[in-house]
Amino acid sequence: MSRGIPLALLALTLGAFAIGTTEFVIVGLIPTIAADLHVSLPSAGLLVSLYALGVAVGAPVLTALTGRVPRKTLLVALMLLFTIGNLVAWMAPGYGSLIVARVLTGLAHGVFFSIGSIIATSVVAKDKAASAIAIMFTGLTVALVTGVPLGTFIGQHLGWRATFLAVAALGVIALLGSLLFVPRELPRSAAATFGQQFAVLAQPRLLLVYAMTALGYGGTFLSFTFLASILQDVSGFSANAVSAVLLVYGVSVAIGNLWGGRLADRRGPIPALSLIFGLLALVLLVLTFTAYNQWLVLLTVLALGAVAFGNVPGLQVYVVQQAQRFVPQATDVASGLNIAAFNIGIALGAWLGGLVVDHIGLMHTPWIGALVVLAALGLTVLSGSLDRRDGITARADGIAVATH
């Protein structure tokens, strides 16, 4: 492996870290932003929804439209757009301009992860491809563990705008790394056409998986979007303590993601998803009652982190399995559309959570989120029964996992 290859992966990983931080840090800043811009918590929560919609549009649509653009040029342009979006957020005079900033960065996010995996595998030997993708996506996990609590801490002490300025600085570093270390000549796979995307969306069994994904994440983010508000307004944690709790949550997420992947490998995606969705619904329901006690809510947040993102490997494995059965010519497209489904779920969950907060109160978000996750569990059981009817086993062997 040449000296330049790990540096190219480092640039991609740093980009993933910056993007992961800007996506999730907003959750810890919602109370601060709402107070500073004089908007309601649900309005601040829409900043999560609109970012996710940007990702959902960016992943399939912009990836198809930019298929002929050289990969390095596109990567640099994406990091430039991402940096500009965060600078707009830093300078945002009001709520409307902050919305524009979130949509811009969301669009960059969607395409970055669509092409990032391709670039990562292009700069290493074929037998190192999976490891290269894993290294790049480590940036997302590290963002949850360190970037989000650190960004929340910065926002609470220096103002929320300072957080976006710090993320913009990371974007500049990632942009320079891409310019310097990512090779200019990279193989280009055939661009996914809109026809291929529509062919995937015409398959009921794939739509079923996308619904599982959207409902599973929608239920999670219905409550998670307002977690910082719950911790401050209901549990009584100080703003500083919320940063520490989010750090603990991020560590738990990292562990849960590994656990979820191993469970899907051992038992197959449907049994793993059934267990994880069931536990997730239970933990969200428990949060409704434990939020009033700081020690109990801390334990509940730990449990929530362990299961909230543990479904990602199983869902991605499963959508690839189903694509190989029904649209083998468009497996990559099917996997990419599942990323869009994740973010549609996030957008709808955050929006619905805002309606719940507005109309019946903050502490109704966990149990309503649990009901949405139970709907995902029901669809998972249905899909598993259809597989058994078709004589399909639940093994996950031989499937490469992409991630959020």
Regions found by a protein language model. Give the residues of each.
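Paired small-residue
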Residues: L10, L81-V88, G96-T105, W295-A303
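Helix-breaking motifs and short loop linkers at transmembrane-helix boundaries and internal kinks
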Residues: H38, P70, M91-S97, G236, ...
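Conserved MFS/SLC helix-loop-helix module at the cytosolic interface between two early adjacent transmembrane helices
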Residues: V57-G96
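Helix-to-loop junctions at the C-terminal end of transmembrane segments
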Residues: A59-R71, G256-G268, V357
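Cytoplasmic helix-loop-helix junction between adjacent transmembrane helices
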Residues: Y95, A101-L140
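Intracellular juxtamembrane helix-capping segments at the cytosolic ends
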Residues: F112-V124, G310-F326
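C-terminal membrane-cytosol helix-exit motif in multi-pass small-molecule transporters
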Residues: A168-R188, T380-S383
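A late C-terminal transmembrane helix in Major Facilitator Superfamily
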Residues: Q322-I360
